[in-house]
Amino acid sequence: MRILLRMKLHKLQKWENYLASVEKMDYKTFAPLEQGSDAELTETTAENLFVQISLYATLLEKYDLKKCAGDGTDFEKTVRIMQWLTDNTFYSGAAFKWNADNPLDILEYAYGQDFSHAICCRDKSVVFTDCLMALQIFAYPICLLSTNSGCHFVTHVYCRELQKWVLFDPSFNCWFTKDGKLLSVWELKTLYLNNDEPVLENYSFNHTDRCKEIYLAGFIKQNLTNLSTWHDNSMDRRGYKRNDWESKKEFKTKLPDFKMM
């Protein structure tokens, strides 16, 4: 079985094969969205989540992030950083390599490489979050989890000019609005629970507009049932021991709604 799985994953390292696999996803397998519960999750503080860790200085210098972000609002800078990440790395839900939760390691593997070095949604979210934090834009990664173990990672970003959290998906270079209003993950979930639909903004699946409906149903809507983040952005558990998922950072913490300055 393990050999067969590796053969399948190897086949999916080609973009056309991975794209075809996403296009063939069966809507019937998607779980219904539920209210979910965070009762078993721990809580955290702003002091835990938003530490200026030492590797941020390296990120800023090595990738010239201030130039990439440019001037403007937190939203404008966030969009530019997300576009930079999209332009320089590929996304794949069948990524062949598991990386440490360390943006320098992830970018060393994926930056400027072809699709065979694509990274998963967790890696995209971690890099995106840390790049924003290096620029002193408050952000944290979110694990979205359905009732049937479907999973996707996105990022919450605090836009100070709006005084609110806004949801971004760096794997698909997009965000969500309703009536022109930028949505948080909580607002997006409530919208779907009320049988309403968001507007998908700026969507890009590795520089194509393919699979939008599958993305909304299979990557986003079904996975909004359970929401969690990491307890802190410290260097603790940012290493990765081969074939040991437990060595990575845990996502067992409630999403905070801090008002940042």
Go through each PLM region and give its residues.
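Membrane-proximal basic amphipathic "stem/tether" segments
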Residues: 1-23, 77
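Aromatic-acidic/polar surface patches that form glycan- and anion
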Residues: 74, 117, 121, 209
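Secondary-structure boundary elements
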Residues: 23-116
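Active-site neighborhood of thiol-dependent amide/isopeptide-bond enzymes
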Residues: 94-154
